[in-house]
């Protein structure tokens, strides 16, 4: 009987305590302010900040730190190094350091020729690899792993090479016939073994060899004049980045963030470094940067790591990530282009909204700006130019990151409704002009001293890849795999 009474009294006391908790001043408000989904309290709404309605859109920049033009450096203080005519553009970013500086081109541009190089972007593959040129030939990679060599003057096709694998070398699942299994019993160990799609990879040319990486999980070395395969190495992992060739080695990053160093003569794997695995990444063709005995690579995780080219030992590492509130884009920290190295500075951009400069030797962070990009920063002397993900082109000081000018290009086809976003690739220098390409099929040139638009003209196709320049000729690869030459 006593036990039953005790249970009864305990129940009454518990109910009274819970009831009183809901009436204690401040507790209800505190709980409401913690809950980010509560819309019933005005104080809670104020704490959450601006909330998007059915017709409202909140800029990501409202949720993060914004860029501001510096009062210390004025556009008239910009001094560029002398322009020069570069003979070649042998790898992604122009050279192994991704820093070709102030490349030259004179006068207004006219189309020289336009050639189809294969299949454009489709559900099985994407055109992500920029063209490269050794000065005589220009090389392309289409959306179906077809490599084409053309004459830079006429655009005439000289040879083709299709990246393909034997059944046992496949990296993705599909159908393999009984006959193939009988011919190669070891293929039973490889699953069903057919690649249905291939995204990623790129090309680089050096010392008479064209190096090819692909989403099929194969790296090849070709004779750059004939297209003959000299060597191939199967990585079993799809390759994401374009190759970087320097000092007898070829560097590339796989889909699972593994950095490979290959022997440029034989294709033998010298060493590998495994970064943090990150499944989400942008559809671009980044590449590691190499200067002297140091290779610097960015990864989809936002990691930026410097290693010794000889053995892959880590010299220093850092990470680029958005410091603002979490947004869908800010959660993707992919360094989607690659680092740029010049004069002891390493500069890299993550698409999540960060651009930072580091000391090449120590890895110490020098400055950071809230500027996200899918493109390589463009260095010229003491200044950095960047095409941001929101359509802004900016000029910054290389030494301290001060923003000198900001130019907002058209961000959407329908500005009022914020529909059909426009992206920009580049920039590159064409003499005393910056040039960017629009995903809506336009080339735009800007004044590098203040960002004003000088000219714009139609290209003849949508473009998502940065243009390249050699011998004062600009080459543009469209999303439909058409290569267009302007001079």
Report each predicted region and the residues it spans.
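C-terminal motif of bacterial Sec signal peptides marking the signal peptidase cleavage site
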Residues: 17-20
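Bacterial signal peptide processing site
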Residues: 22-25
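Blade/loop signatures of beta-propeller domains
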Residues: 49-69, 75-112, 314
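Short coil/turn segments that connect the beta-strands within blades of beta-propeller domains
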Residues: 86-87, 135-136, 207-208, 247-248, ...
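Extracytoplasmic beta-rich repeat domains
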Residues: 112-132, 160-204, 229-246, 269-291, ...
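Structural signature of WD-repeat beta-propellers
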Residues: 142-143, 207, 214-215, 254-255, ...
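WD40 beta-propeller blade core
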Residues: 148, 220, 260, 305, ...
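Short loop/turn segments that connect beta-strands within beta-propeller blades
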Residues: 151-154, 223-226, 263-267, 309-312, ...
